[in-house]
Amino acid sequence: MNNNTNSNHNDIAPEATITQNTTTSVSNDELQHITNNNNVNVQSYVGPTDSVESSSNTADEENEINSFNAQNVKDYEANVGGELPPDDELSRIESNTELSRRATRSIMNTESLLRTASQSSKPLPPMGGGKEYPPMLGSRDPYVVAFDGPDDPDHPHNYPTWKKILYCASVGLAALSVSMGSAMFSQASADIMQIYHIGWTPATLTTSLFVFGFASGPVIYGPLSELFGRKLVMVPSCLGYVCFSFAVATAKDIQTIMICRFFAGFIGAAPLVVAPAVMADMFNNRYRGTAIAIFSMLLFGGPMLAPILGAFTVKNSALGWRWTSYFCGIIGSLALFMNTFLLQETHHPLILTRRAEELRRRTGNWGIYAPHEELKLSMKEIVENNIARPLKMLFTEPILFLVSLYNAFIYGMLYLFLTAIPLIFLGEYHFVQGVAELPYLAMLIGILIGGGMIMLFEKRYIKAMEDNGGKIIPEKRLEPMMVGGFTFVIGIFWLGWTGNYPQHVHWIVPVIGAAFVGNGLMLIFLPCFNYIIDCYLLYAATALAGNTFIRSAFGAVFPLFARQMFTNLTIKWASTLLGCIGILLLPMPFVFYYYGKSLRHKSKFAFVLE
């Protein structure tokens, strides 16, 4: 049995008949639900949870799971009368008991679980009291709880705007606090070196351990949030982040700092996966892409703002380096308060489960149930679905490996600049600490512009999809990357070669180059996820799990060698090296744009539209 993700809830809809051979084929009409369902965009930061593939499934079982077909929708529309809005397939599925039950079992592979249970040789436990086993219920369908149509006020898509904004603010603040925590402590490295008599690399490890923790944490939190709900995962995560942040601030030795930094990142990582899922729970396809793009800008903005706040904090003699963690803990405490007292559960299956519980209590009919109550999760499944198969897929799928490599390089560059910017403006231009970190604002501006450009490209993508008969076009996701690759390379050379000559070049010139770098980072990073999701669809979560592993490795390692590289090679030549790597990766989106479809034809996991 597989654990599931929010992506999977929407990727398998009644209108899709998808068979898995060498290539997964989807007919034009059957794909409409997929093109309408951009819920998979949450995987940009949701990271890995599962796929509908089961390592123990036979080919027949997989076909049975994936054959949740369009006839169900036709029957439903015939019974209800008229079509439901095409942009709300999830509401349509969940508002019909039969579709809801079958969707949940298909997505979570519950059918194979039930078959395994029925075939078990283990004897049933007795009823007790000498009673015989009661007779089986007839049809279970009348007992399945579902939403009362797509306009059900309990469905998160129908929440009032103020409630959606409040919930987004709650989970968004939690995500911002964690992303800031990844970078703010980097400004304390010099003080850490002096106080604990360690070198630069061990001091930088405090940042790398945090990044590795909060980049790999979603491997666990994704499936947990799908099984137990968003809030039940968010609150303990926020609490753990606050506790370990304060533990870092009060630590007496470097070992405690290292350990607590890792656990602050790992335990506090839930907002990175749950926050986009909450947004996807509440927004339909018309607004979901915008919400996720804004969240992406927020997540990238945290590491840009954090060094500025951290530098001025460390510089202030009344505060000092410990307050970089105190501030993170305080912001995290506010997020903890909001998520504890203001956030309510938005995960659709959990809402139905609670409705079923209330109906059982108030009616006394204990046969009433929600499909989600049939599910369970084991550590074995987490390991298989989120570690073993993603790694296998990463190294056997050329599209996934190369795009993930580009994505990981960009992610590593984000944290490499925590060292590069101060070296240029503190070391070359002799700005004081705090002021030397202000150029991060230029990178932030570039990121915000990049986010706006992605929204414009999203409109182009939707129009191209409509012109193509409503069929999804994965290669169209690469257009922002084509632009971002050039702006990133231009920015790297601009920043490095102008920043190396402070006696001849005004400081504003490399600052402008930093804005180009930020713009390129955003234009490359988010479209990489969307392209992977569109290419692998049913296996998107597994593909993104593999992406997360390589991305977290790059994010953790890059800060460790950044200072030595920029010091030994000088700023201009270190930037040249990075720029040349960017040039080598530059053709990738163009190659996949023109040849991606033929590569997908040869893939065991990707799908091709027929």
Curated annotation (Swiss-Prot):
Cite the InterPro entries for this sequence: MFS (IPR011701), MFS_dom (IPR020846), MFS_trans_sf (IPR036259)
Annotated Pfam families: MFS_1
Q: Does the keyword Cell membrane apply?
A: yes
Positions annotated with a glycan in the UniProt record: N3, N21, N568
* CDD domains given in the database record: MFS_Tpo1_MDR_like
Q: Where is this region: Disordered?
A: 47-74
Under the GO molecular function aspect, what terms does this record hold?
A: transmembrane transporter activity; xenobiotic transmembrane transporter activity
Describe the outcome of a gene knockout.
Increases the susceptibility to mycophenolic acid, fuconazole, ketoconazole and itraconazole. Reduces the efflux of spermidine as well as of histatin 5, a salivary human antimicrobial peptide that is toxic to the opportunistic yeast C.albicans. Also leads to reduced biofilm formation.
Q: Where are the transmembrane segments?
A: 165-185, 209-229, 231-251, 262-282, 292-312, 323-343, 408-428, 437-457, 478-498, 507-527, 530-550, 573-593
Q: What is its main location?
A: membrane
Sorted alphabetically, the Gene Ontology BP terms of this entry are:
fluconazole transport; peptide transport; spermidine transport; transmembrane transport; xenobiotic detoxification by transmembrane export across the plasma membrane
* Topology of the protein relative to the lipid bilayer: Multi-pass membrane protein
Q: Which UniProt keywords apply?
A: Cell membrane, Glycoprotein, Membrane, Transmembrane, Transmembrane helix, Transport
Q: What induces it?
A: Expression is positively regulated by the CAP1 transcription activator. Expression is also regulated by the MRR1 transcription factor. Expression is inhibited by tetrandrine (TET), a compound known to act in a synergistic manner with fluconazole. Expression is increased in clinical azole-resistant isolates.
The protein's location, in the record's own words, is:
Cell membrane
Polar residues: which segments have biased composition? 47-58
Q: Which SUPFAM superfamilies match?
A: MFS general substrate transporter
Q: Name one GO cellular component term.
A: plasma membrane
Family under the similarity heading: Belongs to the major facilitator superfamily. DHA1 family. Polyamines/proton antiporter (TC 2.A.1.2.16) subfamily.
Report the protein's function. Answer: Major facilitator superfamily transporter that mediates resistance to structurally and functionally unrelated compounds including cycloheximide but also azoles such as fuconazole, ketoconazole and itraconazole. Also mediates efflux of histatin 5, a salivary human antimicrobial peptide, and is responsible for reduction of its toxicity in C.albicans.
What is this protein's record name? Major facilitator superfamily multidrug transporter FLU1
The taxonomic lineage of its organism, from the top, reads:
Eukaryota, Fungi, Dikarya, Ascomycota, Saccharomycotina
